[in-house]
Amino acid sequence: MKIISHLGPKNTYTGQATRMLAERIEEETELVDLASLEAVARSVALHEADMGVMAYYNYLEGLVQECLDLIYENDLKITGMQRLPIVLSLGAHSENHSTAEVYSHPKALAQCSGWLWDHYRDSKQIPTTSTAAAAQRVAEAKSGLAIASSEALKKYGLDLVGEDIGNKRYGRTNFTDFYLVARENGCAFDKTREYLTMVAITPHVDRPGLLAEILQQTAYHNLNNVKIHSRPALDDVAIEGLEPQMFYLEVVGHRNNDDMRRCIDSLRYKMKPEGRDIEVVRVLGSYERP
């Protein structure tokens, strides 16, 4: 039996994504909900779970930085992805439709900022660990409003005050991408399918045009960059007078594709200082493109 951990409680979009990813695994699975993304990552790293599911990217709000950092710091591998449309609603207890406080996950509050401004601009917004936790809190306290999926609100017996209240961008439905992570690579290469690969690059050198060099290498090896994120380096990098940066690149292709392998080798050669055997490029995993 495979144990899969995910951010709880159960009635969240993460829980739904976890169930969908579990259906692809050709073994019996047990789903375990935990209190935080860090707990999910550590449960896998410490062999308490075989796999974990974490939100990685939202169409409206962008990158979930903590997700990639936890994968990197715990030396995990991304082996799958699930994309879910996100449709958020507002619920209240039938005995008390107080509007003084609105509860939800910080990302959900941000994704509904326009609707909240139009309808409840004077309400205090209070973050919770998940959307389902917000629904549970309002149900138990019999006060306030909760933003969650309609299913979660109904499960906790709340009245629907507003439906599909998320911000709209160019008429596109909001979505979140979720990663399935494990301790080892698990996505085999099939030439008939399309893949994405997440690569972490921590240059131990600095020169003008360094980022352009990285992007030129992917272009030279006929690889398309889907996303690029930068952040202060997580590793100890000694570059005098500068704040060292690292880059996450999501690239179309599988880690075992010949072009990808050649590109990774080239980046490793160019990004590390001469005469020092330092890890500067790490492949965080390959997964089927949604």
Identify what each model region corresponds to.
Residues 1-290:
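Domain-level signature for soluble enzymes in the chorismate/prephenate branch of the shikimate pathway
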